[in-house]
Amino acid sequence: SWSFRLANLLVGNKVEEAALECQYTGPSLKFESDHVIAICGGDMQPKIDGTAVPLWESILIKKGQTLELSFCLTGARTYIAFSGSIQSELWLGSKSTFHKAAVGGIDGRAIQEGQKISLGNSNSKIGKKIKADVIPEISNNGVWEIEVVRGPNDDWLDNNGYQTFLDAKWKLQARSDRTGFRLDGPLLSFNEKATNKSPEHGYEPSNIIDQGYPIGGINLAGQTPIILVNDGPSMGGFIVPFTVPSASFWKLGQAKPSEYFKFKEISVEEAQDMRSYQTLICSEESII
């Protein structure tokens, strides 16, 4: 996440260090020692002991003080980074929590009420801010433009189905999580490759012999597009006509259920340029 990386940079951590991801509403955290923190992403109206504090800035919270986050005024997810980082073990090279498998993070689960979170030590500075022109712009009208690259199975849709996918506004279902974002929208039409195939591919036009799925692949389960995000399956028997590039994942993470996605087709080269730009701005160059 764009915001996640910037939050870590503000408190002097490496961009990949562990931080807290808060979805829709935030926690109340009482600190047992002084720490520098940064809050980035959706605006959950953060307060320390009842006094509002800014986003996109490194701030000091003292021993005995309480940080409180409310519901998201903008966006869907807020990231809290701590100087010295959350102390957690690597699992397959990551400190992220995979809830459904109960692995990673701290005890393989979401933070529980009353739980203590161990933090490291550092000499981070307060008052560091993210430049205004590199803060991600969170949609305030409930519609998100999401870039997609065609493939790997775009040739299973006919011309009408292909264009319908790009022209439609797709509604994000509440039944969405870090495994997949399910969408509601118009029916899509298929070409002969999908409708006149050998039986081993399956009955539905969107069925295919099991194949590998790219992260960000838009899996077409019958007539339901599902964007396979960070904890999604790595293979299955549905076609993937389009793929969301990694540089657009931050938008997915800030979208709330019942908001809309409008897809914009880009080239592989454009997707690579987006990722390079995002990597560039998620660096010390973006801090003042």
Language-model segments: which ranges?
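Conserved "landmark" site that anchors the functional core of diverse proteins
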Residues: S1-I288
